[in-house]
A protein has these predicted regions:
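A short aromatic-anchored loop/beta-hairpin motif
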Residues: 3-10
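Local beta-strand/beta-hairpin segments that build beta-sheet-rich folds
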Residues: 132-134
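Extended extracellular/luminal ectodomain segments enriched in beta-structured repeat modules
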Residues: 20-27, 65-69
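Intrinsically disordered, low-complexity, charge-biased terminal/linker regions in eukaryotic proteins
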Residues: 166-172
């Protein structure tokens, strides 16, 4: 049968396709949502968010029992950037409709002015007839800046969260005084851990990306 190509972009909803008769194998190419950037302080910029992971799986065999079954595709959204100001809220998380969303960025310190962390990216997942076959982790969020130092960038390697459920990225750590908020973890097969808020009037640290399947 001729090659059939379908492309799915982020919509915030679960998208579906049906495996047509005559299909022997499929190739899947996934990109997770990127982490949002941390916001700035007067002393410098926040950290950039990490890019979402790319996963490629080719020649996945399709059995006769899988013909006319449903492929579920959940494209992960990008995390939002942080904002600046006393107590500025962290960037909202990147969403994933299958429970693989990133965390929210950490809030800036309440006094007097710093940057908050960026939200973690949501993972992109593909399921066939309810079975997960591929996941591309979302990127970690960048950290907010303090007056004394910049926020650090989101990190594109995974350190798995111990929270439950484990597929969600961890929320960035809030700053309790004057300083930048931490970047959030990205969603993934193992959700990423968050970065910390800066000590004193310093920038925070970036979050970790989610892992892949």
């Amino acid at each position: 049968m001729p090659t059939v190509t379908k492309t799915f972009n982020y919509t915030g909803t679960l998208q579906q396709a049906t495996i047509p008769p005559g299909t022997a194998s499929i190739d899947v190419y996934l990109w997770g949502g990127a982490g949002g950037g941390g916001s700035s302080d007067a002393g410098g910029p926040g950290g950039t968010g990490a890019a979402g992971h790319h996963v490629k799986k080719t020649s996945l065999a399709i059995t006769s029992a899988q013909i006319n079954t449903t492929i579920d595709v959940a494209v992960g959204g990008g995390g939002a950037g942080g904002s600046s100001g006393g107590g500025a809220p962290g960037g909202p998380n990147g969403k994933s409709k299958t429970g693989f969303s990133g965390g929210r960025g950490g809030n800036a310190g309440p006094r007097p002015y710093s940057g908050s962390g960026g939200g973690g990216g949501g993972a992109t997942t593909v399921h066939i007839d309810g079975t997960e076959i591929a996941t591309a982790g979302g990127g970690g969020g960048g950290a907010g800046a303090g007056a004394g130092s910049n926020g650090t960038a989101g990190i594109n390697t995974n350190s798995a969260t111990s929270n439950s459920p484990g597929t969600l990225g961890e929320n960035g750590k809030d700053h309790s005084g004057d300083g930048g908020g931490g970047g959030a973890g990205g969603g993934g097969k193992d959700g990423g851990t968050s970065g910390n808020g800066g000590s004193g009037d310093q920038g925070g640290t970036g979050g970790r990306s989610g892992s892949n399947l």
